[in-house]
Amino acid sequence: MFLASIANWWRTAPNLVIESGGELAGCGGWSRRRTLFGGDNFAGRDSGLLDPATDAAKIRAFFVAPAFARRGVARLLLEECEARARAAGFARLDLMATLPGVPFYAASGFVGDAAVALDLGGIPVRFIPMSKTL
């Protein structure tokens, strides 16, 4: 089951990696899966695919190595994800931003909703749901 889930994930959630001088500078991706973040092989997760005509694609798993922060890595990744989601027929994007990521996404045209707190292993973590029309 786990291997089948991973195989499905790679087909439906393309991730991008940027390297510089052999070092990982950043990574991120977009998805056509209903699950906004985390794996969909857990109870209560919807593993279905999104419909580009009615649903928003999901921006997922954006990380930039501290040594490469504020050097355009995240912007390059996001622009590529937007282009690929648009090419797949999606007109909107959704994401769940960490609080430090909100200014970046807002500057990139995303609009935030009210903060939500999610329990991550017994620790409540605040996120801001954000969306953007392509």
Question: Where are the language model's segments positioned?
Answer:
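Conserved GNAT-fold acetyl-CoA-binding loop/helix
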Residues: 1-6
